[in-house]
Amino acid sequence: ADKEFQHPYFFQNTYSDQNLYLGHGTLRHVESTALCDYELNRKYCRGIDIDIFVLDGFIENPVLRFFHRTATMIVKKSLRGYVADLNDKMKFDKRLIAWASKGLYRFVSYKKAFAFYEQLFRMVDADKSERVSVLAYRYSSHRRIRKRSSYNEQVWIPFENVVYPAPSDTHDALVCYFGDDYMTPLHLPTAHGRRYLDATRPYQEVVEELKQHPEQFAERIKLLYTD
């Protein structure tokens, strides 16, 4: 996918960017900005993005699923620990994992470790699984787990002057992800917290400005997220 997009679009994943772990793909617009306050010193692209998720096969046997989930979580935590900034505030156990992971990946490429992480999910054939989910992104045994047959047919749904493809049982999908009351409007930050958004300037320019004037981040957030 990284060869399909040209500037200003950039397909971002663990392989394509620096010091980054992602359990999914992201399509970024590099001439824009979407960043959280903890991302000011990160090296990876922080343009406005669209997330792209792969559906993984769900293991129905609870014993096999336990061992599979445990194995993937060990690798995932080590990868997250490696890319973590030790200057950030974090709990003692996460800091310990980060120290250990940074030592480990001096000898082993963390991108090779991520390839192994992906292979753990490929071991479960999604085409033959009764249910699927975005397990590489968030491994849950009770949420976001849906029947594979739900994706056999699509319907097109209008939303804000754009038409989107969706599973035929869209209502069930929305309940699965957001709960029974998903239609009630809520004034909340994004799933990533309060982000600094600028559709007109590249993130490199915004980052340098915010490093010089960090108070502008709070001012921008107040403007974006306050009624």
Predicted segments, located by residue:
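Short acidic alpha-helical/loop segments enriched in Asp/Glu that coordinate divalent cations
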Residues: 64
